[in-house]
Amino acid sequence: MSRVGKKPIPIPAKTKVTVSNGTVTVQGEKGKLERPLHPDVELKIEGDEITVVPVVERRKITAVQGLVRSLVANMVTGVSTGFKRVLEVNGIGYKAELNGQTLNLTLGFSHPVDFPLPQGITAEVDKKNNITLEGIDNELLGQTAASIRALRPPEPYKGKGIKYAEERIIRKAGKTGA
């Protein structure tokens, strides 16, 4: 049995979990998420806990059990409290503005970059050029944050670019004049 997979997932109050036709549906205060369930595992809902049980005990299914448990736990957390990622825009002349569901970024290119936010993701930009992304789907939120960061990743000499707030950029020394 998987160490992660055998841990039960607590279901918070005001959150409802249902399994039907190989699909897990989690509904809570912030919204509703659906995900297809792997055919080699099944969910057992007992009271206010969910357990992921493998159909057949095999080594590969043990890995899948841990994965499914983490995905369902993220769904439950997402619909009850939500997820949040913060990106920092560093550099002279680099700035971010929010225009509806489009993020307008000036990143030192010859043109401004317009990044349309996917449905289910909300953004906020403060004056210090911090972009705060929020949503209930952890996978979509992480992919959106990574796509925004990929527009101008931080460079190691001056640290200019877009980075995660908790990310530490390892700096390099510049050329030494002879």
Swiss-Prot record:
GO (cellular component) term, any one: cytosolic large ribosomal subunit
Pfam families: Ribosomal_L6
Top-level taxon: Bacteria
Single GO MF descriptor: structural constituent of ribosome
Keyword Hydrolase: no
Keyword Ligase: no
SUPFAM superfamilies: Ribosomal protein L6
Function recorded in the entry: This protein binds to the 23S rRNA, and is important in its secondary structure. It is located near the subunit interface in the base of the L7/L12 stalk, and near the tRNA binding site of the peptidyltransferase center.
Family, similarity comment: Belongs to the universal ribosomal protein uL6 family.
Subunit structure: Part of the 50S ribosomal subunit.
Protein name: Large ribosomal subunit protein uL6
Species of the source: Desulfatibacillum aliphaticivorans
Lineage summary: Bacteria, Pseudomonadati, Thermodesulfobacteriota, Desulfobacteria, Desulfobacterales
